[in-house]
């Protein structure tokens, strides 16, 4: 179903900041968890605050899905606490993947003059060669501070497949945009299929 190359294939070790946007049930969190699982299987260290991924039942499913030992999962998958997200860059290591859910709660457009928003931009600009990859998840990218939005290389907008029939829940749509502007025609459009096993790795 993913006939066209994913834009993230251009990632060459520079810091990459991308957005996953969509209403509840659109597939955005599912896609983020899938990305986490794919990177766990590659041996990457990941920091996230996605709900449920650190519950014992979900941890067992993650170990089974990725074929990881208890020790490997503990080393690779690390939880970011709520009080760490506003300065998450102080709690991570180079070349890791960071996946932040509900990012508008910490970097809101209503707090446009908050120093932490400027600090995020400063960190991103001064650590470009450290190989971080950061995924910012939100229901509406407009709710995120403009300075933070401007850091996005790509924004992926997820939508439900709104057709009647039993196959509806098997698929979702992904629209790929360059930067934070989602007006106009997307650069890439994909219809993607859900894998039921991934839902058991977090609280959907």
PLM region spans:
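Short, Lys/Arg-enriched N-terminal segments with co-localized hydrophobic residues
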Residues: 1-15
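Glycine-rich P-loop/Walker A and Walker A-like loops and their local beta1-loop-alpha1 context
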Residues: 16-37
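Hydrophobic/aromatic beta-strand patches that form the interior of the parallel beta-sheet core
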Residues: 18, 47, 99, 135, ...
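Short beta-strand-centered segment that lines the nucleotide-binding/catalytic pocket of NTP-utilizing
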Residues: 44-52
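Conserved nucleotide-sensing/catalytic segment adjacent to the nucleotide-binding pocket
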Residues: 55-122
């Amino acid at each position: 179903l993913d006939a066209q190359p994913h834009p993230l294939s251009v990632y060459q070790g520079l810091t990459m900041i991308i957005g996953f946007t969509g209403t509840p049930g659109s597939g955005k969190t599912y896609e983020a968890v899938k990305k986490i699982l794919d990177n766990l299987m590659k041996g990457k260290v990941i920091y996230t605050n996605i709900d449920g991924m650190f519950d014992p039942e979900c941890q067992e499913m993650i170990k089974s899905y990725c074929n990881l030992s208890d020790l490997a999962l503990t080393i690779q998958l690390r939880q970011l606490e709520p009080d760490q997200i506003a300065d998450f860059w102080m709690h991570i290591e180079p070349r890791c993947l960071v996946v932040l859910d509900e990012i508008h709660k910490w970097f809101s457009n209503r707090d446009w003059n908050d120093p932490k928003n400027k600090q995020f931009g400063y960190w991103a600009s001064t650590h470009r060669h450290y190989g971080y990859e950061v995924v910012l998840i939100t229901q509406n990218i407009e709710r995120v501070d403009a300075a933070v939005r401007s850091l996005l290389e790509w924004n992926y907008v997820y939508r439900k497949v709104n057709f009647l029939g039993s196959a509806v829940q098997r698929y979702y749509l992904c629209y790929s945009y360059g930067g934070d502007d989602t007006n106009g025609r997307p650069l890439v459009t994909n219809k993607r299929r859900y894998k039921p096993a991934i839902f058991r790795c977090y609280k959907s």
